[in-house]
Amino acid sequence: MISDDDDLPSTRPGSVNEELPETEPEDNDELPETEPESDSDKPTVTSNKTENQVADEDYDSFDDFVPSQTHTASKIPVKNKRAKKCTVESDSSSSDDSDQGDDCEFIPACDETQEVPKIKRGYTLRTRASVKNKCDDSWDDGIDEEDVSKRSEDTLNDSFVDPEFMDSVLDNQLTIKGKKQFLDDGEFFTDRNVPQIDEATKMKWASMTSPPQEALNALNEFFGHKGFREKQWDVVRNVLGGKDQFVLMSTGYGKSVCYQLPSLLLNSMTVVVSPLISLMNDQVTTLVSKGIDAVKLDGHSTQIEWDQVANNMHRIRFIYMSPEMVTSQKGLELLTSCRKHISLLAIDEAHCVSQWGHDFRNSYRHLAEIRNRSDLCNIPMIALTATATVRVRDDVIANLRLRKPLITTTSFDRKNLYISVHSSKDMAEDLGLFMKTDEVKGRHFGGPTIIYCQTKQMVDDVNCVLRRIGVRSAHYHAGLTKNQREKAHTDFMRDKITTIVATVAFGMGIDKPDVRNVIHYGCPNNIESYYQEIGRAGRDGSPSICRVFWAPKDLNTIKFKLRNSQQKEEVVENLTMMLRQLELVLTTVGCRRYQLLKHFDPSYAKPPTMQADCCDRCTEMLNGNQDSSSSIVDVTTESKWLFQVINEMYNGKTGIGKPIEFLRGSSKEDWRIKTTSQQKLFGIGKHIPDKWWKALAASLRIAGYLGEVRLMQMKFGSCITLSELGERWLLTGKEMKIDATPILLQGKKEKAAPSTVPGASRSQSTKSSTEIPTKILGANKIREYEPANENEQLMNLKKQEVTGLPEKIDQLRSRLDDIRVGIANMHEVAPFQIVSNTVLDCFANLRPTSASNLEMIDGMSAQQKSRYGKRFVDCVVQFSKETGIATNVNANDMIPPELISKMQKVLSDAVRRVYTEHLISRSTAKEVATARGISEGTVYSYLAMAVEKGLPLHLDKLNVSRKNIAMALNAVRVHLGSNVAVLTPWVEAMGVVPDFNQLKLIRAILIYEYGLDTSENQEKPDIQSMPSTSNPSTIKTVPSTPSSSLRAPPLKKFKL
């Protein structure tokens, strides 16, 4: 692991993710056959830019980026009084050189208007009280709204088309108070009037299974939430009880609340160990924006900053440190001096501790040294991660020396992520298929997008292609300058670019909740890396898409890296196993989500039916374009043929091509025949295509029946051999059933050739493509579905004017977003660090008009309400005057409390937002899709989920009538044997019918009313009586792939 004190090299030694040297392979197709080209031999993508243009526009990235202090002079008015009294001294190491990483603030000396460097800062130390004491011009927590709100509102509405004018207005507003709201580096902390909690009270809270009011108040004050998520309070109270813990929570679930709230409750300090400087920067900035005192200390921190932390430790709530820094002599001495204030040591991204994880870092192993010190050994320790198998968890616990740790886990399943896999062909064509265009953003993927690539060269190529076709993108890898990396990171965080193309090292360093797309252009390193990297998408709970474009040659590059990584043999073997598991996800014809999740939790139950908005395979099955019952294939006979040929003809070690040629009767291999049994095997598989045999071999390798070995003379390739599992199976002669791939299902003839292998039975390889999944509707109606216009609770509630309401809500949301962007630019932070997208959605839907009504806004901390609340409220008031839209909408006036409670229990966050918007505003699916920036098919799928739980919809707005429901019921009973699993034959059976999306709702209503027949002996429907689906022109598709939660037009139908 690289120390924070060191200059960052272009690679991380010993890591699987390190960049290949120029002599190693990147893009060659046949690694085993030929030595790959070097980077210098490859064609490069050129750009018609001058050298200066390239320097100005190109970006770079690295996971351990440290904000530099590039000084860009700009004229702003500065008061003499502040300049004289608020000067921060800098040590001798400070300079204008951007590579020095100096964190001190520059204050001008005397003139009223001077050249003032704008410092790009990684926030370190702040206070309000000390500045008030130093400066004659005191300031409060926010801009004086009495003085500037009216003027700012008018200017904000009129001047967003002119960014330079906007910047000057906001700078002038700040200098009215003489101090920016975000204080600069090198300053002290604010005093919070929080009473010290005695030990008895702390232990009382630790014993409470339900959170006390004090905890709920702190949660609302700092995080804006009115209640804890499941298991969050359990983790918090165990911290209060002084217990060690291992916490495994999926990305976006709220791990930070678990380790941040205890210090805020107890008025104590938490030391957070985090692997990446960029991640620490983002998290500290977010905490400060909420009025929480936090500091980051790393190898670039000055001695002044260390001294200021030591002198103000009673005020600091959080210290973020890298593992190298916290275990250094200087770091341990600081912990010792702060010991009486420290209540918790939090190890974030704890999977880095384990050598069996995908991102092992040796520096994390040294954290156990803290437990060796008598003065620090009693600090409670909590290890947190979103990615860990049982083996990794046990390794982390052992290496950190956690004492009888309490283990808390949540589901790995992130339902708002849609998984899709594609073959990579032409770069521009592959990526262009999923783009949209608008006047403001140009071409984009529907929201902030991260594209991961395996090599720096591929990053540069993808970025060049994107720019050429009009995408605002930047590249981010270790090969360029620190300034370029910093600019790319900052511009992406602040939405100045829509897409960032990066090497996989960038993944853990992103802390942006509204990433809508994660695209892998090239195969990920392994299944755990893939899960970690797609975890960057949709952390705000909104629908997001995860795509992989890959080719088999990508696997060769990864295997080459593994073989040459000089890691322990057992570690390489484990990483290779995880690569095989990923390959299964990429090639399966079944649910990709299921294949992904069962790696982390073998007990994860396979869903009984296809899941809406789950993955591309489920979408294909819902459309009727694929048979879900054929996710397992029987390849007993063919496997025996292949294994016998490998052992008898090639002495158990060979490339896969020669045994296949032998089985298919190639004249190249007939010279090997020496016995009668060998003659019988020669050409026995000639009726089966070559690509089918290769797919079978790949599947047997993934399943562990075939192994890979590298002979001494083989530099790049490897050969296959029967594994111990394969040898045992060959002796037993049992059935061989493996996970199907599209080629295994489609590429083989239905009738297998008669077997000539003793003891082998006729193959039942692929199931008939006419079989369809079964989901049998119950025979009798068990309850009646009530739409919204028949629901008594909804009919008796307060009505609101709905004419044009969805459009008005969307317009208001746009104005609110513009104000947020303006404030973010003023403070030089990302827009989501001002308030989240969810908060803006609440403002647009509930429309509060006073400070007291801000309590209805969930997710907005007390500090955010104080600083920014009036800006958004004023915008709502002005918009209401212009449009007449209703304000101060109480959710209980529109939706009964009982219904709200049910929604919260049975619907995910993303589904609940879509359902609530439809229910309150009586919107059509198209209106909801436009407002939320997702596809119309996604809206229908989400609403169908609500219907299956019995929640009411405005069916008249969705073009669903009782007549259509009756027609659909009759068709499924008469023609399909009550099988509602697949929509395509159902549509054909009905004739003139609603479209697929409306049929989704009808099916959900029928399932709610009749239930499903769960008997094991249910008869399958007669395939012969079903309408033919052989004509592709009659097969429709369901555009159910989610796109984005940004305000953009809904996606067109996807080609899957």
Curated annotation (Swiss-Prot):
| Keyword Membrane part of the UniProt annotation | no
Q: Which residues bind Zn(2+)?
A: C591, C614, C615, C618
**SMART domains reported in the protein's UniProt record:** DEXDc (SM00487), HELICc (SM00490), HRDC (SM00341), RQC (SM00956)
Q: Could you tell me where this protein is found in the cell?
A: Nucleus
Q: Which domain of life is it from?
A: Eukaryota
Cofactor comment text = Binds a Zn(2+) ion per subunit.
Chain span(s) of sequence motif DEAH box: 348-351
Record-level GO BP terms: determination of adult lifespan; DNA metabolic process; DNA replication; double-strand break repair via homologous recombination; response to ionizing radiation; telomere maintenance
**Annotated PROSITE patterns:** HELICASE_ATP_BIND_1, HELICASE_CTER, HRDC
The role this protein plays is:
Essential for the formation of DNA replication focal centers; stably associates with foci elements generating binding sites for RP-A. Exhibits a magnesium-dependent ATP-dependent 3'-5' DNA-helicase activity. May be involved in the control of genomic stability.
Family per similarity comment: Belongs to the helicase family. RecQ subfamily.
Provide the protein name: ATP-dependent helicase wrn-1
Organism expressing this protein natively = Caenorhabditis elegans
Tell me the gene name. Answer: wrn-1
